[in-house]
Structure formats: C-alpha cells, structure tokens
Amino acid sequence: MKAELCQFCLRSGILCSKCRAKLERGEVTRLDLEIARLLVSIEDKYPLLQDVYFHGAVEADNILAILVRRGDANKILSYGGKIIRFLEDKTGKSIRILEYNTNERKFLEDLFSPLSILTINKIWLPDGTVETRVILKGRKKSSLNVNAMREIAKRVRGITLRVEFAD
C-alpha cells in the first residue's frame, strides 16, 4: 500500500524524522497513521492492497471515511467485503470508502451509498455562501447518519450539504 508515510514507519510503528515532521505539521493525523498501519498489516493476505494509494481518513460520529486514489475503492471493496469487516472490527466504526480527487457527484454517490441520488443542486444564499442540496431516493433510513455525512463532506471537500429525501 502506498501512503503519505513511508513503508518502514507503517510496518515498524516507529516514525522516522520525515514522517514525524509530517505528523507535527498536520499533513498526516494520528487516525491516518492508525488506519494505514491496519491496511499494511493485511497487505500480505489481500495482495490487491499493495496497489492502493491511501490519502487519509476522516471520522465523524461513528463513521470512518477512508480516502483512496481514484479507481482504488473497488480494490478495497473486493474480497467479499472482508477488508471492510476487518477494519470495522478493529476500529468499532462503520466504514465508508471514498475516492479522492473525483468529481462532486461521484463523491456524493460514494458517500450516500447504497442510497440513490435523484438530484444534486447548488443553492446560492444571500450571504454569498453556497450549499449543495442532495435529494436521495426513498424514505429517511434510520441506518443513515445524515449529520455524520454532512460533517465528512465538509471536512473532505469543503461542501456544505442540505440533504432531503423523496419517493
């Protein structure tokens, strides 16, 4: 697996001076380090992980969003979901795999998966801010934590979301 931190640091758990500096500057968080180490630990069991580029992780409420390079989400979702289950067991959180540097629609589809997005609109408010309205198909699902999804979208992409449901 490729990441912002070097392989030696991820495998050993001891940070070199370069990786320690990245952590101190805030380029990498403790959560990023923890998740990257978990992914590296199962790399031998799941060889597809060797080609995955891990960008970072964001946590909101009880949901953990893992950011990977465009096209790498399918590699983590493969193996019948065993990688996701492993991460959920180790972290105790619900896992979302999101692709970094994709268009806004793809990002939102991944974020709200398995629900379908009917429409996405931009709302320009009088104070000059912009909100993105997402209308999801179906009734409000109890399994979907809308506030956590808003928080993840804000931290990852800087998007302010307004989520609605329609039949």
Model-assigned labels for residue ranges:
Residues M1-D167:
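RNA-contacting regions in translation and RNA-metabolism proteins
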